[in-house]
Amino acid sequence: MKTDDFDYKLPEELIASYPLENRDASRLLKLNKQTGEIADHKFTDFIDFISPGDLLVFNNSKVMLARLYGSKTTGAKLEYLIERIKNPKLFETHIKANRSPAIGSEIYVEDTLAKVLDKDGGMYLLEIQGDKDIYQLMEEFGHIPLPPYMKRDDEEFDAERYQTVYAQDLGSVAAPTAGLHFSKELMQQIKNKGVDIAYITLHVGSGTFKPVQVDDVESHKMHAEVISVPVEVCQKIRQTKENGGRVIAIGTTSVRSLETAGQNGQIEPYQGETDIFLYPGKKFNVVDAMITNFHLPKSTLIMLVSAFADKEKIIKAYEHAIAERYRFFSYGDAMFIY
């Protein structure tokens, strides 16, 4: 299976660089994965596509203010993208610099000195030497790490809009974007309808934006991300399945978490890392339907939705979305694949 099979041409003006005024004002392309039937809707119509007995699974990870700036002791400028926090004084980060800092050297993260303990590929392990910890530095100086394709600096409103309304567990460097469409009002309507809700956690890593760089899909190595699928979520899923309801994953992060926990055919609680890679030919044991945004060409995420719904149907749906001027990527419109 070739990576080029998952390519498509997207007019640049369809990349959504800014969010709409209201979260739930986006559009929703409905795709029947059995028949390939496509229908255009408003996102708020989603309430009509779900029934009591269905279970919606959301990712409650919260985006960190992960972009920070600093310098070497020589004054040379540095830019950080915090990837993973080990403890308040110890963290993994990407560093953008003219010349890479050496292991053992001391550098500034904003106004605070840190020591470079290790380097693995493009990832540095830093330990803060000063009084402040990484949480305080992010709180005081941090920026929302917008995806590179937005081609703009973060603005004040991004701190709210690039975060889901139910975000709780700090740790992502990118938003679980399918959840951005859900307003507090829509969440309330879902509850009022008698549809059950559950939360898992997957902390999205920067690898989510990494294009597949090998020719053969099967030889791609996925980045690892930290997930938590609690016992009570597994119980809800079993109950939903037994009663004939559907498990509807909100976003590919929820899909990957649930399918990791259900890899043996039976959903089990899971805490730890996942590098699950779902591409055509892979089986889904847990998820019956999903809400997802439109994904980048040749990305692992367009491969995931192609595994769920069949590649030809997905490419056709994307062609329809382009023709109908849907908005693409993180701040863009969504699909309901069922």
From Swiss-Prot:
Keywords for the protein's UniProt record, in alphabetical order: Cytoplasm, Queuosine biosynthesis, S-adenosyl-L-methionine, Transferase
Enzyme Commission number(s): 2.4.99.17
Compartments in which it is found: Cytoplasm
Top-level taxon of the source organism: Bacteria
Pathway info: tRNA modification; tRNA-queuosine biosynthesis
GO biological process: queuosine biosynthetic process; tRNA wobble guanine modification
Leader sequence segment: none
InterPro entries: QueA, QueA_dom1, QueA_dom2, QueA_sf
Subunit architecture: Monomer.
PANTHER family given in the database record: S-ADENOSYLMETHIONINE:TRNA RIBOSYLTRANSFERASE-ISOMERASE (PTHR30307:SF0)
Protein name stated in the entry: S-adenosylmethionine:tRNA ribosyltransferase-isomerase
